[in-house]
Curated annotation (Swiss-Prot):
It comes from Azotobacter vinelandii (strain DJ / ATCC BAA-1303). PROSITE patterns: DIHYDROOROTASE_1, DIHYDROOROTASE_2. GO terms for biological process: 'de novo' pyrimidine nucleobase biosynthetic process; 'de novo' UMP biosynthetic process. The active site is at D248. It is an enzyme of class 3 (hydrolase). CDD domains: DHOase. The gene is pyrC. Zn(2+) 2 binds at K100, H137, H175. It comes from the Bacteria. One of its GO terms (molecular function) is dihydroorotase activity. NCBIfam families: pyrC_dimer. Its cofactor is Zn(2+). Its EC number is 3.5.2.3. This is Dihydroorotase.
Length: 348
């Protein structure tokens, strides 16, 4: 196995940066590794139009470390009230790269999301015409559906319909967690891609539940059984261009995670590429990490690949037990544990 990896600088095609004082943490950590990142719009209130996206983009840019060229790629939050004109205006701005479908109530700050897929069919048509990709949080929210089955049900009830009705629409099935999702993406057209997180590659529901509940493994979509984890590893390391890096790094203050009703989300941005390297090394596939992290996503979005490089070295280091997060603190994934790869710090 190699002791050093030189990779074309990767991008993160799904990240939560939050807002306000949190940006000093999240933007710094993301910019350490990534050239660009697709920024999720689920703020309070959400980012619903080009004006709000532009203002949020400026706040992110202001939080970048000195001399950083990190580029936030903005997205819109789809609601039942989104209009085709919102889509056309956003596309024309040049800095909005996608729109996000959150089924109402599916995850953090999704209460303003779409209540019925049919409500946004005119919007999806406008997106297809404008060439604006659709990002999908693929879970149904019916109370009678088991939380471990929500992704499969979303495919059957919603995603199949979307793709059949809008075959020219680019769709990213985000943070996939099941063998069903892998198979769906593999057998769909080239307009359908998927992001995979490091934590879904490295962990399954046993890590979260066996021997005590570990709240910092709790995320949505929730960790699944090991057979699904294995399917994700197969997909990520296969070389299939439909699968690419998206951390879904989602920070919450420590008190909000370690609570009787804790928030969903794992914070991985501080060591994202190191965690992916561990996952790929499990499959003896480090030679395929660069394509997954640095090629496939940019190619899917039709954006030029980065031209600079990063270097990873095989060197153990200990993840911080706690990190500052605005006025609070957060506990990152793998807090206090050893990581096997380390990113050499270089300015972009």
């Amino acid at each position: 196995m190699p002791d050093r990896l030189i990779l074309l600088r990767p991008d993160d095609w799904h990240i939560h940066l939050r807002d306000g004082a949190a940006l000093s943490r999240t933007v710094t950590d993301a910019a350490r590794t990534f050239g660009r990142a697709i920024v999720m719009p689920n703020l309070v209130p959400p980012v619903r139009n080009a004006s709000e996206a532009g203002a949020y983009r400026q706040r992110i840019q202001a939080a970048r470390p000195a001399d950083s060229r990190f580029e936030p790629l903005m997205t819109l939050y789809l609601t039942d009230k989104t209009s085709p004109e919102d889509i056309r205006t956003a596309k024309a701005q040049g800095f909005v790269h996608a729109a996000k479908l959150y089924p109402a109530g599916a995850t953090t700050n999704s209460d303003a999301g779409v209540t019925r897929i049919d409500n946004i069919f005119p919007i999806l048509e406008a997106m297809a015409e404008a060439g604006l990709p659709l990002l999908v949080h693929g879970e149904v929210t019916h109370s009678e559906v088991d939380v471990f089955d929500r992704e499969k049900r979303f495919i059957d009830e919603n995603l199949v319909r979307i793709i059949e009705h809008f075959p020219t629409l680019k769709v990213v099935f985000e943070h996939i967690t099941t063998r069903d999702a892998v198979q769906f993406v593999e057998t769909s057209s080239s307009n359908v891609g998927a992001t995979i997180t490091a934590h879904h590659l490295l962990y399954n529901r046993n890590h979260m539940l066996v021997g005590g509940i570990r709240p910092h493994f709790y995320c949505l979509p929730i960790l699944k059984r090991r057979t699904h984890q294995e399917a994700l590893l197969d997909a990520a390391t296969s070389g299939n261009t439909k699968f690419f890096l998206g951390t879904d790094s989602a920070p919450h203050a420590r008190h909000a995670k370690e609570a009787a009703c804790g928030c969903a989300g794992c914070y991985t941005a501080y060591a994202a590429i190191e965690l992916y390297a561990e996952a790929f090394e499990q499959r003896s596939a480090l030679d395929r990490l660069e394509a997954f992290a640095s090629h496939h996503g940019a190619d899917f979005y039709g954006i030029p690949r980065n031209t600079d490089h990063i270097t990873l070295i095989r060197e153990e280091w200990t993840a911080p037990a706690c990190m500052t997060f605005g006025e609070h603190s957060l506990v990152p994934l793998r807090a206090g544990e050893k990581l096997r790869w380390r990113l050499l710090e270089e300015k972009m």
